[in-house]
């Protein structure tokens, strides 16, 4: 798998129990090459404008993402997971979307570091 891929992975829910959810692989983390991932949700009303990103049937990369419904890529729903916990590649998002997510997350972290 590589950055920008969409896979299934167990992520903790509000009740603390893990549930298989789609995730976008953002990047591998040192020293063990675990994956920094962000959760994907169909709860579009949870969008943080200018931070999260929606993907749906009108987007060129929706079909190849493997997602079944319009979804929200939630940059505020992060996890670091070993590759062994990634269960099956569903598809991938466009390289431009992947890069935009990384830049947006990096800018957010930089702004918090300076504060």
Name what the model sees in each region.
Residues 1-115:
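Conserved functional hotspots at enzyme active or ligand-binding sites that engage polyanionic ligands
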């Amino acid at each position: 798998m590589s950055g920008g891929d969409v896979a299934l992975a167990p992520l903790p829910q509000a009740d603390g129990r893990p549930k298989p959810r789609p995730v976008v692989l953002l990047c591998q983390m040192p020293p063990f090459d675990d994956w920094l991932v962000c959760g994907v949700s169909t709860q579009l009303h949870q969008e943080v404008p200018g931070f999260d990103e929606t993907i749906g049937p009108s987007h060129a990369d929706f079909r190849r993402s493997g997602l079944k419904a319009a979804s929200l890529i939630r940059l505020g729903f992060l996890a670091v997971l070993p590759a062994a916990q990634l269960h099956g590649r569903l598809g991938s998002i466009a390289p431009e979307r992947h890069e935009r997510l990384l830049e947006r997350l990096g800018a957010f972290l930089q702004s918090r570091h300076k504060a």
